[in-house]
């Protein structure tokens, strides 16, 4: 699955961008001192995994979910409606999980080199409600570009699935890093369009695409989220 779903007009993207900037005090610094980026909201791939410091996912979402809901309630309603129509199923959020949130890169920190190649397996780490009734075989991931740098933006994917990697390990007893497996696979670049949601399986190997050059006035703002089918509906989160 790799689908493009129009969600916002240019004017609506600008409205979201301005609101994100108005919430500057709610940005959470990520990355390094040399190449910082920010999130608005709890990000499961950072805040829910077992690293040092200990996971703070639930603690952060208690603070950030009310802020996001207050300022972007109309955006979430639009997002869930578009996804519901496309997936032909109910789409909802859950109080135990972070709302879809924002990635923010600015200026020369916009990625110009390759970022991590990965599968989206965050659902294994978060406090997922109704786990026995959740279908983990077909997770969803999505990106909605709000503002893109001068060099554009997009997603790199490879024709390699999480299931294939798991089967390889089961057959050989040897864990092969995805970076190594990807060398023999086909890479495809999927360009982003402002206001158009990119929807794909989180079990497809992927990577944020870098730009050739970053400029001081560049900005990259995207709404990020995932989905899991649970008890007859898609629950979206970040």
Where are these regions (language model features)?
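Extracellular structured ligand-interaction cores
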Residues: 97-99, 137-143, 152, 205, ...
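Catalytic core of non-heme Fe(II) oxygenases with the double-stranded beta-helix
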Residues: 110-191, 235
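Catalytic core of Fe(II)/2-oxoglutarate
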Residues: 168-238
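N-terminal auxiliary "cap/dimerization" subdomain that precedes the catalytic jelly-roll/cupin core
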Residues: 1-66, 70
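Localized chelating/binding microdomains
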Residues: 13, 20, 88-89, 190-193, ...
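Short, flexible loop/turn elements at secondary-structure junctions
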Residues: 8, 103-108, 119-121, 144-148, ...
